[in-house]
């Protein structure tokens, strides 16, 4: 059985052009995440708050982030994308958070083939409301679970590229030697 985290070609995962794996469709409340052993999606929980994911949410294969998981990605798209779909994207920014006392970075990405969004090249170009929805969601989505999340910083494309490169290198060091 294929494990989408590991078995996608490294040629398809570059800092400026990568395939994201969607775990949660925009508008969803069910929190799915990668089961690292099988490569399947596993339901982690239903969100306790009345909020829903403001964008398609997933990960970048062949990356390893500081939290021990593949690097998280929010894909801004005019359509809801089905879980376990691959979508070719480019990064426009990053949200840096603290989640449960640990660093947690979320890349903001755009599909190459979505004409509604593919004119945006940096998070600073987004309409403010789009970013405000994402920020609000990540600051409250665990509140009723009595867990604290804090947004520390939002950065543009160049910082996102650096984080992706680091997570690709960390993955390579951990799994490809």
Description of each model-found segment:
Residues 1-177:
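Hydrophobic N-terminal alpha-helices or hydrophobic patches in metabolic proteins across all domains
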